[in-house]
């Protein structure tokens, strides 16, 4: 896998589109480990394959608000 990422959708993306996107992650061999469904923040955490990651990077600004690597953030 490309690694663990948190994918946040833009406001106004339909639940159907979000479900479809998560299904694609699984179909491509990735996993969904957590889902976020709060007012103003919908998305998921999971392990993405390199092809899913590339596809999502192409959707940024359109469907996806942000993609962040899911890891422990350390500050120096």
Curated annotation (Swiss-Prot):
One of its GO terms (molecular function) is serine-type endopeptidase inhibitor activity. The keyword Acetylation applies. One of its GO terms (biological process) is vacuole fusion, non-autophagic. The modification N-acetylserine is found at residue 1. The keyword Acetylation applies. Keywords: Acetylation, Protease inhibitor, Serine protease inhibitor. Disulfide bonds: none annotated. InterPro entries: PBI_I9 (IPR052471), S8pro/Inhibitor_I9_sf (IPR037045). Specifically inhibits an intracellular serine proteinase (proteinase A). Belongs to the protease inhibitor I9 family. This is Serine proteinase inhibitor IA-2.
């Amino acid at each position: 896998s490309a690694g663990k990422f948190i994918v946040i959708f833009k406001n106004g993306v339909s639940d159907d589109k979000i479900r479809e996107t998560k299904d694609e992650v699984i179909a491509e061999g990735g996993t969904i480990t957590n889902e976020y469904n709060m007012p103003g923040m919908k998305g998921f955490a999971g392990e993405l394959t390199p092809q899913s990651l590339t596809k999502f990077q192409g959707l940024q600004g359109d469907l996806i608000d942000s993609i962040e690597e899911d890891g422990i953030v350390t500050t120096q």
